[in-house]
Design a protein with these regions (language model features):
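Extracytoplasmic/secreted envelope proteins and their assembly/folding machinery
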Residues: 71-74, 78, 95, 99-102, ...
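Metalloprotease/metallohydrolase-associated module, dominated by Zn2+-dependent proteases
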Residues: 99-154, 161
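Beta/coil-rich, acidic/histidine-enriched accessory regions frequently appended to metallopeptidases
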Residues: 161-181
Length: 181
């Protein structure tokens, strides 16, 4: 996507990422880079006015040149792509698609956290590790049942959000099933 700067390149910015509220991230996408500096400042933020992903180069977190970092890059790139198509998507769907991107690259998040939280709601996003794992499992299931990566791409392409977006992707892919089935 090159909507803002007309440059098809994506900048991968490697830096030592400080912790946020006690959590250290392997990478992140900032939607503020997708608007002008003037717009970002109205939110008290700044914009690089380009397609940019931030990746942690602290080897204590993840090897910045190792195969796991490719999965992190795929995860963050999915956020960038999804934002350009559907900036109002619910977090649980966007994160589920991003977690699925990590599965495709062979280094998904470990399946920890979810077994200790089996009552964790799929569509209620609290940014807990169990939320990420749960959406990873659910979107991997959707992929396996309804057409692989092409189906996940269809979900990303839908401009309707949340459950309705998944149902619309099912219909667009020729499945006569709804979310509650």
């Amino acid at each position: 996507p090159d909507v803002l700067d007309s440059d098809p390149k994506v900048i991968f910015f490697f830096s030592s990422i400080a912790s946020f509220m006690g959590t250290v991230f392997d990478g992140y996408f900032s939607s503020f880079n997708q608007i002008t500096e003037a717009e970002a400042m109205t939110y008290g933020e700044h914009s690089n006015e380009c397609e940019m992903l931030y990746l942690n180069c602290d080897k204590n977190q993840v090897d910045p040149v190792g195969p796991a970092m490719l999965s992190v890059m795929a995860h963050e790139l999915e956020h960038l792509i999804h934002f350009e198509i559907d900036p109002y998507e619910e977090s649980w769907v966007d994160e589920g698609c991003a977690e699925y991107a990590m599965v495709l690259f062979g280094h998904p998040d470990p399946l920890t956290g979810f077994p200790q939280n089996p009552g964790n709601g799929l569509t209620v996003w609290d940014s807990e590790f169990a939320d990420y794992v749960q959406t990873q499992l659910f979107f991997t299931y959707l992929s396996e049942q309804f057409g692989g990566a092409a189906f996940i791409k269809q979900i990303v392409s839908e401009t309707t959000t949340s459950i309705q977006g998944i149902e619309d992707a099912l219909v667009s892919s020729g499945f006569q099933i709804n979310f509650d089935s």
